[in-house]
Amino acid sequence: MDLQEKIRVIENFPKEGISFKDITTLIADGEALRETINRIVKHLEDKKIDLIVGPEARGFIFGVPVAYALGVGFIPVRKPGKLPGETISVNYGLEYGEDQLQLHKDAIKPGQRVAVVDDLLATGGTVEGVAKLIEQAGGIVASLDFVIELTELKGKDKLEGYDVLSLVKYDI
């Protein structure tokens, strides 16, 4: 199945000059959603994964079913003030400025092998921050897995040394 055919592209959204890759059409198609999850699971099944981490919010959409299929837990990474327990934080760069991500302090045990699952790899800033959080908690980043990669933004360059999977690649 060609997953790219299942992703709607909306020009000039959310602003002029942006070509938005809309995953809602992919996740609305049960067969395409199953195929997406199965491809990520296949990539991870021999990596001895202990946990799946998904960044807010679309990482939850793909991360939870991957965790379920692998029989492992799912850990959310969220923006500040969204997690009720004690957290660890990392600041990460955006195109214009910085933002922060948080993880429950006790969510990852030292030495656990963790895969990050998210919808999109663009500039790499968010996933680089997530990887730092996992490592700060003592986890091992075993894989970074994306449904879509915007290759022109060169986010993969920031992820040198990590195993990276992108199911669909766009040159924007």
From Swiss-Prot:
One of its GO terms (cellular component) is cytoplasm. It is found in: Cytoplasm. Pfam families: Pribosyltran. CDD domains: PRTases_typeI. It comes from the Bacteria. It is an enzyme of class 2 (transferase). It catalyses: AMP + diphosphate = 5-phospho-alpha-D-ribose 1-diphosphate + adenine. Homodimer. Catalyzes a salvage reaction resulting in the formation of AMP, that is energically less costly than de novo synthesis. This is Adenine phosphoribosyltransferase.
